[in-house]
A protein has these predicted regions:
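Gram-negative outer-membrane beta-barrel transporters
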Residues: 322, 358-363, 449-451, 466-541, ...
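Outer-membrane beta-barrel domain signature, strongest for Gram-negative TonB-dependent receptors
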Residues: 212-334, 443
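Outer-membrane beta-barrel signature, preferentially recognizing the C-terminal barrel domain
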Residues: 255-274, 305-310, 374-377, 389, ...
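Periplasmic-side early beta-strands and strand-to-turn transitions of outer-membrane beta-barrels
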Residues: 137-138, 150, 157-159, 165-167, ...
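Extracytoplasmic beta-strand/coil segments of soluble accessory domains associated
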Residues: 66-106, 127
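Short acidic/polar hinge/loop motifs at secondary-structure boundaries
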Residues: 106-133
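N-terminal periplasmic "start-of-domain" segments of outer-membrane beta-barrel proteins
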Residues: 28-60, 88, 96
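Repeated loop/turn-to-beta-strand initiation elements of outer-membrane beta-barrel proteins
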Residues: 186-189, 199, 234-237, 275-283, ...
């Protein structure tokens, strides 16, 4: 399904510098994540969503990245409390370890937990977000069973401009950010810094024995930067960096105020060179770090857990008489340190090939990849997709693909509870979709079946083993367009996420969930409402601890004072709905946020 949130121009180099396109206001939405090569989002065979900067700003600083993702088709979110607390993202019913997170093409996340710190990535530093639902290991390797979410940081172009934002709201929430961006034909640059803080509320409630009634503060300081230098036509050198440092309080009883300090960072440098009219080479290398320090009653001086990922990629894009060829080599070195517990590492060497083509009414995509992991050996994955334009307004498309997840370092080596003999989890997915677009309206329907085997689960002695299986089957329906002067987007998901061995529903997955957004621009004023609904869930495996369904209504407004200044406001959870996404953990009640933005056009 394609939800095109904007037709504004996108600078493709932001995700994969090899794929730069000239900016222009008449360009359609572009994605690179679906194929690792630039293409129109509405022509992607993979189930793809692109969230542009306008939509991110509309979400407002009172929204987090996980909350924004949860408003997209096929995605569910659960959180252990309010802002900055541990958050899980599920795509099409897969678990949180089955989503690969990229920042400007670089992997970012914890190799000990197997998940990303979604809650710590600030929206103020993001230019756009690309979401690919379905298996993507044939493009990106391990962990892309449910899909890939890629964050693209802010870039610069045109005359140098300063931009800034300041805002405040409920729960003692406040945010400030500022940046500068600009560029010429030879050089482009951007830099932005920000800080946010909230007094928040108690992460837990009385259902849990570790409940503490105090507010669990969260704060986040962040920075991003980007540059690109073009010394000659067809040649470009550049890089980007994202850094976010946070502190989050959490409940662990009344006798101690526990908190953790975390830092997420990702940087990369690249060289893109068009050697001939048909051949472009891109070399990129960089590093990401997930650094976590916990201060608790059992560790008053702090306990550090750190993941470092060094990454190298050499990609070749070759234009063929029919279609385009992709060939690449990657090297990934992962090192994880759990203070006083283990200090381990592994390396992965990967080779991949891909071919995409449009032949008349036919669209094709083929990908194959082999990953050789020093810990568990080799894995080969593949993807085949086909689309056919039945009518100028109607397309049918389908795909099959395999994927896998690598065991985490905790699962492998945690003292007394690790299993170094673990193998990778495997997945095989089939899907088919219909897409209709006419007169500014688009409708889509996607059906998928994903079978995951060799799942890692704990035995009766809490030792992880490859013993479980899952069946995920669902339908995603979507609409985007304009009705009676209102911009409208909507999605509805039906999901059957089962443990294949017990027949029970998987934990924290709803069978039905939906999103609706309606907005209207009246001269300088933009008004909108949003609604997100979810069916019931179970907090634990084997359908233990039921969680009720819920619906949350939000409203927002923006008024442009002139070409440079605007005032913004949001009212979240208007009806003050009390609900939980995880048993015993609170969610925000009714709250407001107002801000002033300076952004010269």
């Amino acid at each position: 399904m394609i939800i095109r949130l904007s037709a504004a121009a996108l600078t493709v180099a932001s995700a994969f510098p090899a794929m730069a396109l000239a900016a222009g206001t008449d360009q359609p939405t572009v994605t690179v994540t679906a194929t690792r090569q630039a293409q129109r989002a509405d022509e992607a065979i993979a189930d793809t969503t692109v969230i542009d900067r306008e939509s991110i700003e509309r979400a407002g600083p009172s929204f987090s990245l996980p909350e924004l993702l949860a408003r997209q088709p096929g995605i569910q979110m659960s959180s252990n409390g309010g802002p900055g607390k541990a958050t899980d993202i599920s795509i099409r019913g897969t678990n949180s370890k089955h989503t690969l997170f990229l920042v400007d093409g670089m992997r970012l996340g914890s190799a000990t937990l197997g998940t990303a710190a979604w809650q710590d990535i600030p929206l103020s530093q993001i230019e756009r977000i690309e979401i690919v639902r379905g298996p993507a290991s044939a493009l990106y390797g391990a962990d892309a069973i449910g899909g890939v979410i890629q964050v693209i940081t802010k870039k610069g172009s045109g005359e140098p401009k300063i931009n800034a934002f300041v805002g405040a709201g409920s729960y003692g929430t406040r945010e400030v950010s500022a940046g500068v961006a600009g560029g010429t034909e030879q050089l482009s640059y951007s830099a932005r810094g920000g800080y946010s803080q909230t007094e928040s509320f108690s992460a837990q409630n009385r259902k849990l024995s570790t409940y503490n009634a105090d507010n669990d503060l969260y704060r986040n300081g962040n920075f991003s930067g980007n540059f690109a230098w073009r010394p000659a036509a067809g040649h470009e050198l550049g890089g980007s960096v994202l850094y976010a440092e946070s502190r989050s309080m959490y409940d662990s009883g009344r006798s101690y105020n526990n908190y953790n300090n975390a830092a997420q960072s990702a940087w990369n440098l690249y060289s893109r060179n068009r050697f001939t009219d048909i051949w472009t080479s891109t070399v990129r290398f960089g590093q990401s770090i997930d650094d976590y320090e916990n201060f608790a009653s059992y560790a008053p001086n702090g306990a550090t857990i750190k993941t470092t990922q060094n990454q190298f990629m050499w990609q070749h894009d070759v234009r063929l008489p029919i279609g385009s060829l992709l060939a690449a080599y990657e090297n990934l070195h992962q090192k994880a340190t759990n203070e006083g517990t283990f200090d381990v590492s592994r390396s992965v060497n990967s080779f991949l090939l891909g071919w995409t083509a449009g032949i008349g009414a036919h669209k094709l995509q083929l990908n194959a990849r082999h990953d050789d992991n020093s810990q568990y050996g080799g894995k080969t994955t593949g993807y085949a997709g086909y689309g056919y334009q039945i009518l100028p307004t109607l397309r049918i498309q389908g795909s099959v693909g395999s994927a896998f997840r690598a065991p985490t370092f905790n699962e492998l080596y945690y003292p007394g509870f690790g299993n170094p003999d673990l193998k990778a989890e495997n997945a095989y997915n089939k899907e088919i979709g219909l897409l209709w677009e006419q007169g500014g309206h688009n409708l889509s329907a996607t059906y998928y079946r994903n079978r995951i085997s060799n799942l890692i689960a704990n035995d009766q002695n809490f030792i992880p083993r490859n013993v479980a299986n899952a069946k995920l089957e669902g339908v995603t329906l979507g609409y985007g367009g304009q009705l009676a002067g209102f911009d409208l987007t909507a999605s509805l998901d039906f999901l059957d996420p089962k443990d294949a061995d017990t027949g029970k529903r998987l934990q924290r997955r709803a069978n039905k969930f939906a999103n609706l957004s309606i907005s209207r621009r009246i001269q300088a004023l933009t008004l909108g409402v949003e609604w997100r609904g979810s069916g019931d869930r179970y907090d634990r495996a084997n359908e233990i601890r039921p969680l009720g369904g819920y619906g949350v209504l939000n409203a927002y407004a923006k008024y442009a004072l002139n070409q440079e200044w605007a005032v913004e406001g949001r009212m979240n959870n208007l009806l003050d709905k009390q609900y939980e996404t995880a048993y015993g953990y609170n969610t925000p009640g009714a709250n407001v946020f107002f801000g002033v933005r300076y952004a010269p056009k």
